[in-house]
């Protein structure tokens, strides 16, 4: 699917590898971290971060894992430690083709005053010059050091954002984390999904609003540990539009339970653990993605039949979902097993 979020696994929707965040900790001090935005950093820092990020982005575009590995912080450049990043580079490279790369935002994150064995979040607040907005970082277990965060945009039919966490080692900026993210789903960007979500919310179509707000968040944030004034506003709007059944969230530990009663026999119960939007294989259509818990995957035919019934139960319970999606992909999940995927076109679901 074209909206894969980490490596080559659809399930790991949140993308990126953060290298070296495993230390035994003591509480951090509030003043231990500072952020300097692009407008206020020194020219040496600004050009150093920008050049390093662009070189890394070019290496990713070329699928040159060896070059990325050579520019990675030493403790995570061994073959075994670098393997997850290498897989991510290879999965991302094919999506960038001949896109033009441009460094669009950089931040200097100074954590040089953190305690030696601090594993708490390293919090950075970055007020943006001339505005009331800010960008915030909360990086778990960040080791002491001078860091930078750089965002490289790609242009093309399917734009991407390549974000890099860099650490300065002996005057050289090296890779400490890599976070590639698609910037569009089914040909639309995050702002479009945000506006559409607002429209659905006003129409009291809360299930569509909740999904579209979520997709806007997914497309607009550069990494899971980054927030901003705009993202906070988006998340507040999503909370306000959350359907009553989802107030407590939806997860493997807190599934959404739907029951379907057939003409004959007892009710069937479906436990949904995740629901979101995603592009079709060709990037042209928007599909609804459902993850449903399965106790047994040994009989593929039975799993497929159950997944089809689960999709119909969801669409019957929330008819508005039929209007926004081309198809439904159901992932039947069972612990310790690869999910069984069933695809249906909504027009073929009675």
Q: Could you tell me what each predicted segment is?
A:
Residues 182-267:
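Acidic, serine/threonine- and glycine-rich low-complexity intrinsically disordered segments
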Residues 33, 123, 144, 148-188, ...:
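Short beta-strand edge/turn micro-motifs at domain boundaries
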Residues 80-81, 86-159, 187, 244-295:
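Surface-exposed, charged secondary-structure patches
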Residues 56-68, 197, 201-207:
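Short helix-adjacent coil turns
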Residues 3-19:
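Bacterial N-terminal signal peptides that target proteins for export
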Residues 16-28:
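Bacterial N-terminal signal peptides
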Residues 34-44, 50-54, 66-133, 217-247, ...:
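Short solvent-exposed beta->alpha transition segments
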Residues 31-62, 74, 177-192:
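Short, low-complexity N-terminal intrinsically disordered segments enriched in polar/charged residues
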């Amino acid at each position: 699917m074209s909206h894969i979020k980490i490596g080559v696994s659809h399930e790991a929707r949140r993308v990126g590898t953060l290298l070296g965040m495993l230390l035994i900790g003591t509480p951090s001090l509030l003043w231990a971290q500072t952020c300097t935005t692009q407008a206020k950093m020194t020219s040496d820092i600004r050009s150093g971060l920008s050049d390093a990020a662009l070189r890394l982005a070019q290496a990713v575009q070329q699928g040159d894992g060896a070059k990325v590995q050579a520019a990675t912080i030493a403790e995570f450049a061994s073959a075994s430690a670098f393997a997850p990043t290498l897989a991510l580079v290879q999965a991302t490279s094919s999506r960038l083709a001949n896109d033009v790369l441009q460094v669009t935002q950089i931040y200097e994150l100074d954590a040089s005053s953190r305690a030696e064995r601090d594993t708490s979040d390293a919090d950075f607040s970055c007020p943006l010059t001339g505005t009331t907005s800010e960008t915030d970082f909360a990086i778990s277990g960040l080791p002491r050091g001078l860091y930078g965060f750089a965002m490289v945009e790609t242009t093309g039919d399917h734009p991407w954002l390549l974000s890099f966490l860099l650490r300065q080692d002996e005057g050289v900026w090296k890779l400490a984390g890599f976070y590639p993210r698609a910037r569009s789903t089914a040909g639309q960007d995050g702002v479009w999904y945000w506006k559409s979500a607002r429209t659905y919310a006003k129409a009291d179509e809360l299930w569509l609003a909740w999904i579209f707000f979520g997709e806007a968040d997914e497309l607009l944030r550069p990494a899971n540990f980054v927030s901003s004034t705009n993202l906070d506003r988006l998340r507040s709007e999503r909370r306000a539009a959350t359907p009553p059944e989802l107030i407590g969230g939806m997860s493997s530990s807190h599934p959404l339970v739907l029951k379907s009663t057939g003409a004959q026999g007892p009710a069937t119960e479906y436990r949904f653990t995740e629901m979101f939007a995603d592009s079709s294989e060709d990037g042209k259509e928007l599909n609804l993605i459902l993850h449903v818990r399965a106790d047994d995957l040994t009989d593929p035919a039975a799993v497929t039949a159950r997944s089809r019934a689960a999709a119909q139960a969801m669409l019957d319970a929330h008819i508005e979902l039929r209007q926004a999606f081309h198809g439904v992909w159901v992932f039947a999940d069972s612990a310790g097993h690869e999910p069984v995927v069933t695809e249906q076109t909504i027009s073929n679901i009675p």
